C-alpha cells in the first residue's frame, strides 16, 4: 500500500488532530491494531526498565541483588527466543505476544509479593521478566513486518517512535514524582512499598488492555520453517561482534542508573527527572543526526556512542560522587541514541 496524504484543514490544533486521526484510519487494519497495542505497552516499558531496580535498592541496598536480577532477565531472553520458535508452530502469534506483555506484570507482582527480598526470589522475578521480554521482542518484529509494506513503513516506525518518546518523557517523571512524594510526604502512612504495588496494578491494567487490543487483529502466524542455525555468513559474524560491543554498553543502561542514583544522588524522583530530561535530549539528538547524516557516518556515530559510554564510566569511577553520577548519566543519555542510530541501520543492511 502506498502512503496516502490527507490534506489537513487550516484550523486549530483540534482540527489538525482530527485530520491526523482520519489519516491514521486510512492504513490497514492490522497495522492500526499493532500501533495501538505498542502505544499502550510503550507506557509499561519505562516502568519495568527503571523502577524495579529502585525497588530492589530501596528494600535491600544490595547492589549484588540488582545485578543478579539483570543477569536473570538476560538469561531468560535467549532461552525464550529459542522456545518461541517451537511454540509458534502450535500457538497463535498474537497469543504469544500477549503472553509476553502480561508476564511483565506477573514479574513485578512476584517481586512485590516477597516479604523479604532474597536473591532466590529476585532471580525468579528476573527470569519471568526475561520470558516477558523474549516473547514480546521475538514476535513484535514479525508482526510489524507482516502488517506493513515498504510504502507505509516509514509512517509506522515514525508514529511508534513518537509514542516511545512521549512515554519515555512522561512515565519516568510521573512515576518518579509519585514514588518520591510518597516517601517525602508520608502518603499511604509512609508505606512506599504500597505505592510500588499501585504502580504494579497500573502495569497490569495496561498489559491486559494491550493484550485485548492485539487479539482483535487478524494476524497470520509465520510459515513453519527452520529457525536454528549453527553456521553463518562471515558478514553476520562481524555483525555479532558489533552486537557484543553494544551489549556491553546495554548492561550499563539497564543496571547502572537505578543503582547509582539511589546510592549517591537521591531517590525515585531524581531518577525519573533525569530519565525524562534525557529522553527529550535523545529525541532532539536523534532527529538532528537523522536529518543531517548519511550512511557513511554510521560507524563513526556508533564509535562516538561507545566513546561516550567509556568517558562516562571513567568519570564516575574517578569521582564516585553525585557529580560523577550526573556526568555519567549525561554521557549515557547522549551515547545511547548515537549507538542505536549507528547500529540498527547497519543491522538492517
What would you call each of these model-derived segments?
Residues 102-117, 307-324:
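C-terminal ends and interior cores of transmembrane alpha-helices
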Amino acid at each position: 500500500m502506498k502512503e496516502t496524504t490527507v490534506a489537513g484543514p487550516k484550523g486549530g490544533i483540534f482540527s489538525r488532530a482530527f485530520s491526523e486521526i482520519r489519516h491514521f484510519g486510512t492504513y490497514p487494519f492490522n497495522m492500526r491494531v499493532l500501533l495501538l497495542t505498542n502505544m499502550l505497552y510503550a507506557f509499561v516499558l519505562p516502568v519495568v526498565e527503571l523502577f524495579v531496580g529502585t525497588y530492589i535498592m530501596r528494600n535491600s541496598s544490595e547492589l549484588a541483588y540488582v545485578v543478579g536480577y539483570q543477569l536473570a532477565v538476560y538469561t531468560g531472553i535467549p532461552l525464550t527466543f529459542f522456545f518461541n520458535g517451537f511454540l509458534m508452530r502450535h500457538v497463535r502469534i498474537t497469543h504469544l505476544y500477549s503472553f509476553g506483555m502480561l508476564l511483565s506484570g506477573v514479574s513485578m507482582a512476584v517481586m512485590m509479593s516477597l516479604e523479604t527480598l532474597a536473591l532466590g526470589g529476585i532471580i525468579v522475578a528476573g527470569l519471568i521478566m526475561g520470558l516477558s521480554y523474549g516473547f514480546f521482542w521475538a514476535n513484535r518484529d514479525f508482526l510489524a513486518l507482516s502488517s506493513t509494506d515498504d510504502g507505509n513503513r516509514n509512517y509506522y516506525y515514525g508514529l511508534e517512535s513518537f509514542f516511545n518518546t512521549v512515554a519515555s518523557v512522561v512515565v519516568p517523571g510521573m512515576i518518579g514524582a509519585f514514588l518520591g512524594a510518597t516517601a517525602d510526604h508520608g502518603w499511604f502512612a509512609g508505606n512506599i512499598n504500597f505505592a510500588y504495588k499501585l504502580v504494579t496494578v497500573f502495569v497490569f491494567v495496561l498489559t491486559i488492555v494491550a493484550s485485548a487490543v492485539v487479539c482483535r487483529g487478524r494476524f497470520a502466524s509465520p510459515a513453519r520453517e527452520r529457525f536454528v542455525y549453527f553456521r553463518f555468513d562471515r558478514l553476520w559474524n562481524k555483525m555479532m561482534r558489533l552486537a557484543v560491543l553494544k551489549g556491553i554498553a546495554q548492561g550499563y543502561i539497564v543496571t547502572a542508573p537505578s543503582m547509582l542514583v539511589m546510592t549517591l544522588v537521591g531517590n525515585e524522583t531524581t531518577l525519573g527527572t533525569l530519565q525524562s530530561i534525557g529522553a527529550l535530549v535523545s529525541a532532539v539528538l536523534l532527529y538532528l543526526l537523522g536529518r543531517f547524516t548519511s550512511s557513511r557516518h554510521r560507524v563513526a556515530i556508533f564509535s562516538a556512542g561507545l566513546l561516550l559510554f567509556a568517558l562516562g564510566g571513567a568519570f564516575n569511577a574517578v569521582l564516585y560522587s553525585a557529580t560523577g553520577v550526573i556526568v555519567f548519566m549525561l554521557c549515557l543519555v547522549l551515547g545511547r541514541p548515537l549507538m542505536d542510530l549507528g547500529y540498527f541501520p547497519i543491522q538492517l543492511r
